Swiss-Prot record:
Function as written in the Swiss-Prot or TrEMBL entry: Binds to DNA and alters its conformation. May be involved in regulation of gene expression, nucleoid organization and DNA protection.
GO cellular component: bacterial nucleoid; cytosol
Keyword presence, DNA-binding: yes
Protein's name according to its UniProt entry: Nucleoid-associated protein lpg2755
Oligomeric and partner information: Homodimer.
Amino acid sequence: MDINQNLGNLMKEAQKMQQRMQEAQQQLSQLVVSGESGGGMVTIKMNGRHDVTEVKIKPTLMDEDIEMLEDLIAAAVNDAVRKIEKASKEKISQLTAGLNIPTDLMGDKEGE
């Protein structure tokens, strides 16, 4: 292949990737996950845009130490964020599976 053909193929792959990324962003924005802490004492619902849409606190926690409640809320939010990030990575992996993109261009630094 000559360089023009390589560039043409690269542009086609980039266009496919852009379209797939837009589709993935749309799908991920509709995703809703639940993060929890304290064995379900605090539950947070978060969408794919990282917006917290619901907070549930067991009534028995309202009589507890406020610092513990704050810690449980933070832990539940962090749990939800981790779930969103995992779902996002899985979706991106699915999208890039059929494309001829070098893996070092994907910014995956888990192996480092």
